[in-house]
Swiss-Prot record:
Job description of the protein: Required for maturation of ribosomal RNAs and formation of the large ribosomal subunit.
Residue stretches of biased makeup (Acidic residues): 453-471, 498-525
Protein name: Pescadillo homolog
Residues found modified as Phosphoserine: 453, 457
Domain BRCT: 321-414
Comp. bias intervals (Basic residues): 544-553
Source organism (scientific name): Drosophila pseudoobscura pseudoobscura (Fruit fly)
Compositional bias annotation for Low complexity: 620-631
Matches recorded under HAMAP family: Pescadillo
A Pfam family the protein falls into: Pescadillo_N
Subcellular locations according to the entry: Nucleus, Nucleolus; Nucleus, Nucleoplasm
Length: 631
């Protein structure tokens, strides 16, 4: 038997460098990158890099050999090779100015078909929904881009169309569950076929060109090329699941014969679709106002009353209430407020919404409509206001959805300081720092309290001294009033302030009290004798207070931790150190957040005190002015 040579078996044969893979596939670097992105092949990190690189110690980009073999049988490879041939022939035709032949070749441009790759990477529809987060986030981002060198206008328009179609499905199915506003954009989470799909809709900012070193638009554009095909298949399946016509269409009642429709019906329909404010055409001709919940409540009632079943019942009831949260409410969006995120939010939960017709087409009612219940405003004041509606800031909608109930609007009025906007995507039972507002939201009894510092204790003592001084002043006033009253009583009564008849009655009462006191003394003597007899039988020893030495407890904890560190196996020591480091950083972050919160609370407390002092000062000045006027 021949002995195998070094690096002919094992880890050395499992990996291949990028240069060798390009040479094997006979592609350029850009084509190889494009092929890997479309097929979902990515670099791998070997366990022993030196063995995988056949003794070489330099850092190389490695791929699995089986992945490269998998790419060899892909039909796209031939299309990418055809691109090279096409480019050479078209450049030759341009050079010799053979425009007739050039026109014929441009008509035969080789196109890459990605349908089979989508089916290959996502065998089931649920697999496609699980991978929809990055797809939607990137499509929403590209839908806001202008026409660039590496991003054609057709691609941005396609991204815009696909995202609008998906939003129409979310509104029709009422599958939105969580929302959040951050500096990155608007976070949305929908529940589709039991899968949670989360995406980000960016804020509307002017486009700022980025350098190639920061953002590689070419690579991102390749991802978008694949994601548009995936999203198109997904939208088609989702629309047909709700019996909606695809591509989206409107009922004939909406397309009235007017000047706009006569000019250009296609642009009229596309504008109304982008408005997200109209119901779409259904194929079954039956429009259901409320979709049935995914959970069968009768089946849950037949099962036992286990904790899991009870939790599922409660969740199903909350979701059914959430789907009609804004039902019966009418909203009007001011022109300074972002329209699209709020329209998605309101219509997904059963509300009606409109805006100024000059901002975007598709407005259904004007601002002077008396049936409007809420107007969403993001400015300090308004010149004209209606009594019949509430003027609120946009955060009210997001907080209502996250808490699954209609919150009071007084904290969200114009000019009010908004309450903290809590994220619904964090775990309420996490080990890290939890703000007091979030604790109070889940359980009011768990509001955070912290130990008082020296400054806080001094402030509390000062407050107590002020209260004592006020109380002493009040007592002195009461004493003075009592003395005046007794003086008047002495003037009109007996010499000591008591009448003669009252003196006789008081003497009789004193005699009765003396008799009662003698009887009480006899009872007390008997009780003391009994207690002495009981004490003789029992023996009680004096106890000692056990004082806990915090320093010794801390030392014991440190010693125990060191013992645990010594008992860790050598191969697990790096992992143990990493875990300890992560724990320390978490504790430090939590401590910093608590300290920051204490400082904020102290500043707020000081501001309230200053406001109270100012109010007292103004009240005293007003009282002094009033006294002068009376004189």
């Amino acid at each position: 038997m021949r002995r195998p040579k070094k690096y002919e078996a094992g880890e050395a044969t499992q990996y291949i460098s990028r240069r060798a893979a390009i040479r094997k596939l006979q592609l350029s670097l850009n084509d190889f990158r494009r092929l890997c992105i479309l097929k979902g092949v990515y670099p791998r990190e070997p366990k022993h890099r030196r063995r995988a690189q056949k003794g070489s110690s330099e850092i190389k980009i490695l791929y699995h050999t089986k992945d490269i073999r998998f790419l060899l049988h892909e039909s796209i490879v031939w299309t990418l090779r055809d691109y090279k041939i096409f480019a050479k022939k078209t450049s030759r035709d341009r050079a010799i100015k053979d425009f007739r032949n050039l026109k014929r070749r441009l008509a035969l441009f080789p196109e890459i078909k990605l349908d089979h790759i989508v089916k290959e990477r996502y065998p089931t529809f649920i697999d496609a929904l699980k991978d929809l987060d990055d797809c939607l986030t990137l499509l929403f981002l590209f839908s806001t881009f202008p026409s660039l060198h590496l991003i054609p206008r057709e691609q941005s328009n396609l991204c815009r169309r696909l995202t609008i179609e998906f939003l129409h499905y979310v509104i029709a199915s009422k599958s939105l569950r969580k929302v959040f506003i951050s500096i990155k954009g608007y976070y949305f989470q929908a529940e589709i076929k039991g899968q949670k799909v989360t995406w980000i809709m960016p804020h509307y900012y002017p486009f700022k060109p980025q350098s190639r070193q920061e953002v590689d638009f070419k690579v991102m554009s390749i991802f978008v090329e694949f994601y548009t095909i995936l999203q198109g298949f997904t939208n088609f399946r989702l629309f047909h699941g709700l019996n909606l016509a695809y591509p989206p269409q409107f009922p004939s009642s909406l397309l009235q014969d007017n000047e706009d429709t006569f000019k250009d019906e296609a642009s009229f329909v596309s504008d109304r679709i982008a408005a997200l404010n109209f119901e779409l055409l259904r194929t079954d001709k039956v429009q259901e106002d409320e979709e049935e919940p995914d959970i069968d409540m009768e089946l849950l009632e037949q099962d036992g009353d286990s904790k899991r079943i009870i939790k599922m019942k409660q969740e199903a009831q909350e979701v059914s209430r959430l789907r009609t949260l804004f039902k019966g409410l009418k909203f009007f969006i001011n022109r300074e407020v972002p329209r699209e995120p709020l329209v998605i939010l309101i219509r997904s939960f059963g509300g009606k919404v409109s805006w100024d017709a000059s901002v975007f087409p598709g407005a259904t009612f004007a601002e002077n409509d008396e049936t409007i219940t809420h107007q969403i405003v993001d400015r300090p004041s308004l010149s004209t206001q209606y009594i019949s509606r509430d003027y609120i800031q946009p955060q009210w909608l997001f907080d209502c959805v996250n808490q699954r109930q209609l919150l009071p609007t007084n904290d969200y009025f114009l000019g009010e300081t908004l309450p903290p906007h809590l994220s619904p995507f964090v775990d309420s039972k996490r080990d890290s720092y939890i703000p007091p507002e979030e604790k109070a939201l889940h359980d009011p009894s768990l509001i955070e309290t912290h130990e008082q510092s020296e400054e806080e204790s001094e402030e509390d003592e000062a407050e107590k001294e002020e209260e004592e001084a006020d109380q002493e002043l009040l007592d002195a006033q009461l004493q003075l009033a009592y003395q005046q009253e007794t003086a008047e009583y002495k003037k009109y009564g007996g010499p000591d302030g008591v009448n003669e008849d009252e003196e006789d009655l008081s003497e009789e009462d004193d005699e009765e009290d003396d008799d009662e006191e003698d009887v009480d003394k006899e009872d007390v003597d008997e009780q003391t004798k009994r207690k002495q007899q009981e004490k003789e039988k029992m023996s009680v020893q004096s106890g000692k207070v056990h004082k806990v030495n915090k320093r010794q407890v801390h030392k014991a904890e440190v010693d125990e931790h060191r013992l645990q560190a010594r008992m860790v196996k050598p191969r697990h020591r790096n992992l143990f150190r990493k875990l300890i480091r992560e724990k320390q950083t978490k504790e430090k972050e939590e401590w910093l957040l608590r300290k920051k919160r204490r400082n904020i609370d102290a500043d707020n407390k000081e501001a309230k005190k200053a406001a109270k002092r100012e109010a007292r000062k103004q009240a005293a000045e007003a009282a002094a002015r009033a006294a002068k006027l009376v004189k």
